[in-house]
């Protein structure tokens, strides 16, 4: 392993396998002409640090572990790689992407469709909470790429509507969450149905040691493109805490903050569905315009809320961690942790909502006396310092 500071690394230090070279431009990756057109039409000019290292390795067929910060183009890293290796003449599933949430799976589908705009690519989002008949119809028609959640994908494979014999690549996005206890068995279920030579790509902002250890079960001699853990807290995101003496005082603190700030768009995180519903009602009673989302809402409702937020029709979204991983809304300038996350690794996914692709952002954590230990644990884990919020926080967001 060695530390590498190559093209577009923006001072991020990668602990990367020695054979990994840096491709400074997309042309240097020798991609299909139609794919290059899609990349430039999507708005990319040059590859990010993780893209310049990982895409070529994945396209060579190597099993790959790619770890980089939220907002650095991880989704495009594997999407471009998939589009390079599939054969669109063959209308069979050739790549499978598994994600922990329905929203993320749908977003990945839209990125693949956009990047593959000049390639006539078929990509279907195979997710729970949707009409199973639509899945069957789309899969029977033939999809080059399937982006889905583990439960529905496993179900479609078992029913033989998702045919796996042509699959050459499996991507596990947000792998730490996927491989947590909830999804582990479903991942193994899916993996058992894939051809033995299937290439595996693991992508995430955080890769705890136990996850890296577990990847040995289904990866062969993987190439690593890794960023050191203590580099993971996002550059460009200012982190603060507000000491709140009692839980009951958090709401007044939030209202005061809301009155003080001019917010483009903000996300407020709570730890439970019940808290999300309660806070949404309280904010509306106080005449604030907010929308909310959690995992137990019907999928159609979640889609509609996401659409409104993406289009800027709603400025503040209150959510559980279902929203914390990989959802890309460019205008988010502020994240408020109304509750500190119970899992310290979700902290980086939450605050990664603001300041994406080098934009500036602010993360504010509400901390009761019970939370001080959790805050210190987060600081230690990410080798970062979270300061008390200054009086002039409004200037930081302007």
Swiss-Prot record:
Residues reported in the UniProt entry to bind ATP: 68-75
Family matches, as Pfam families: DEAD, Helicase_C
All copies of domain Helicase ATP-binding, residue ranges: 55-225
Record SMART domains: DEXDc, HELICc
Catalytic activity: ATP + H2O = ADP + phosphate + H(+)
Compartments, as annotated in UniProt: Nucleus, Nucleolus
GO biological process, alphabetically ordered: rRNA processing
Record's keyword terms, sorted: ATP-binding, Helicase, Hydrolase, Nucleotide-binding, Nucleus, Ribosome biogenesis, RNA-binding, rRNA processing
Helicase C-terminal domain: residues covered: 236-397
Single GO term (MF): RNA helicase activity
Residue interval(s) of motif DEAD box: 173-176
Sequence motif Q motif, location on chain: 24-52
UniProt KW Ribonucleoprotein keyword: no
UniProt KW rRNA processing keyword: yes
EC number in record: 3.6.4.13
Broad class of the protein's primary localization: nucleus
Domain notes: The Q motif is unique to and characteristic of the DEAD box family of RNA helicases and controls ATP binding and hydrolysis.
Function of the molecule: ATP-dependent RNA helicase involved in 40S ribosomal subunit biogenesis. Required for the processing and cleavage of 35S pre-rRNA at sites A0, A1, and A2, leading to mature 18S rRNA.
PANTHER family xrefs: ATP-DEPENDENT RNA HELICASE DBP3
Family: Belongs to the DEAD box helicase family. DDX48/FAL1 subfamily.
Protein name per its UniProtKB record: ATP-dependent RNA helicase fal1
Species for this entry: Aspergillus oryzae (strain ATCC 42149 / RIB 40) (Yellow koji mold)
Gene: fal1
